[in-house]
Each structure stands twice: as C-alpha cells, then as structure tokens.
Amino acid sequence: MYQLFRHGIFQMDAEKAHDFTIQCLKLAGNPLFQPILKSLIHAPKGFPKTVMGVNFPNPIGLAAGADKNGDAIDGFGALGFGFLEVGTVTPVAQDGNAKPRQFRLIEAEGIINRNGFNNNGIDYLIENVKNARYKGVIGINIGKNKFTPLEQGKDDYIFCLNKAYNYAGYITVNISSPNTPDLRQLQYGDYFDDLLRSIKDRQAILANQYNKYVPIAVKIAPDLTESELVQIADTLVRHKMDGVIATNTTISRDTVMGMKNAEQQGGLSGKPLQHKSTEIIKRLHQELKGQIPIIGSGGIDGLQNAQEKIEAGAELLQVYSGLIYHGPKLVKELVKNIK
C-alpha cells in the first residue's frame, strides 16, 4: 500500500510531497481516524528503555525536520514510534531559504535539503505539543533565527529553552544544520563553551522553577575532523550534557557524485549518510566512554544498519529519510527488533 502512496508523492515536488504527507498524518491523527491508522499499521509494542533519565516506550524515534511545527504528532505517533522529535523551531517564525529547497536523489535513496529552519515559531509548536494525545516521549529541537547574529545566538536558544522546558520530554540544541549561515561555528571553541555553559545554567534554574529535570541533548554534524570530534566530546562531558545526537546531514557529496541533484547545495541525508554517521557514533562512543548517551541518526533504512548503529554505541535511534523511501513498515520492523 505504501508503494502506491510513494509512487504518487514522488510525482510531486519534494517539499510539496512532504507538506501533503504532513496534512495526511495530521488528519490520520484525528481521534476519528487514528483507530483506522492504528489498525492498518499494527504497530508492535517494542522494548522500553530508559535513557537520559527518561522512560522511552521503545528506542525508535522520528528525527527532527519531519514535523517541524508539531502539526502531525498524533499521526506520527500512530506509526509506533517510541519518541518524536519536533522542530527545529526558532524564537519567531521564519520562511527559511528560497524554494525549491528539497531534492530527492532517488537512485541513492538520499535527500538534499537547504530549508533553513522554516517554521512557525516556538509558540505555535508548543500549542501543538500541549494539545497532542501521543503517549510517547516528545523531544523539542531548538535553533536560532537566521538574522540573529552568531554572537547573540545563545539568546535564541535560551529563549526557546524557557518556552519548551515544561512541555518537552527532552530538548535538543541544534547547532549543526548546514543551512543557516555560520550556525556550525557554534560547535567549536569559545562559542560552544559559552553556549553550553549558558544552557546548563538556565536548565538548573528551570529545573528548580518547575520541580523537574528535563534533559538536554546536542545535535552534531557528521563533517568533523578527528580533532574536532575529540574537542566536542570533551566539551560535552565537561558541561555534563545529557545526550548527543549523531548526526545531522552532511555537506559531503563523496557517495553521490554524478547523480541527479547531487550538485544541489544543502545537507544530504538518507542512505548516503549511513556509513559516515555510524563512524561518528563509533568514535564518539570511544571518546565519551559511556558518560553521555548517544542517539544515532543518519541513513537508517533497515534492521541491519540500525543494529550497526546500536553496536557502534547508540542507545536510541532516529529515522526520517528512510521513512520516506520505505514507509511505515520500516518503523514496525525496527520497533519489533531493536532493544
């Protein structure tokens, strides 16, 4: 059945297909229709897991970027995910980069996007999170507005942290998208140190205010040198971050040279990212020595490479591009088998 749906949406522009799918899932998440979707999916229960002090119904999650505004939380939830990461969301709404900005690399099962954090703003997303009936864990992925100077970038993250804290199962600090100018600079040196210090200070204040501890993860890029990775791992440990998501999309085109759309600018996700993200997880795991849990993301399209990420050191997994190419059966297979 999904093959028919995929054939139809693949006739459409990639972003229009994405928006259409979100609307379908929003409708399917409606209390009137959700039982129908659940009966079609027959999602298995999966294996509960506690990571970052949070109880996840199963270790398979939806990666950020799929549901930027939290419009289809209940629809995605019906597919069987143990957790959903909504966003990336910024303090105020922004249009993102010029269209077209999403491109399929069908022969490689990859996607290039240069969206640029298009979203309706944090307040809109929080309302959707508050209204969701989904019983799994909801993570909120936060970023900075495009026109906020890098030097003031931490203010945007603190603003979003304040808004999201009471409604999130966990919060992800996204400093690794290649589509916001200079954003990845926040992964390095004094910027990184200063950002994490500010975030941890604010987390302590909010934990006291709301009488609960909400863990904070950092999402990193796959395009890191060995020394950069070591430095990032050291900084994460030093600031006692609660988790790390490895990885975001890649700007490398080594695995897709010569393919249609490979020349498009932006972040490449899907199967071409599979090996690279697993290698980063493996190296990160060696550096972190179990002190900080890793959430693995990047190119998961089946049980074998999902298991490879677990063996490399990931405790939770996230999918997105694989869902586009393989449909809900991918989620079902992973939930049924990954512990």
Curated annotation (Swiss-Prot):
It catalyses: (S)-dihydroorotate + a quinone = orotate + a quinol. Pathway: Pyrimidine metabolism; UMP biosynthesis via de novo pathway; orotate from (S)-dihydroorotate (quinone route): step 1/1. The active site is at residue 177. Its EC number is 1.3.5.2. Its cofactor is FMN. Keywords: Cell membrane, Flavoprotein, FMN, Membrane, Oxidoreductase, Pyrimidine biosynthesis. GO terms for molecular function: dihydroorotate dehydrogenase (quinone) activity. This is Dihydroorotate dehydrogenase (quinone). It comes from Haemophilus influenzae (strain PittGG). The gene is pyrD.
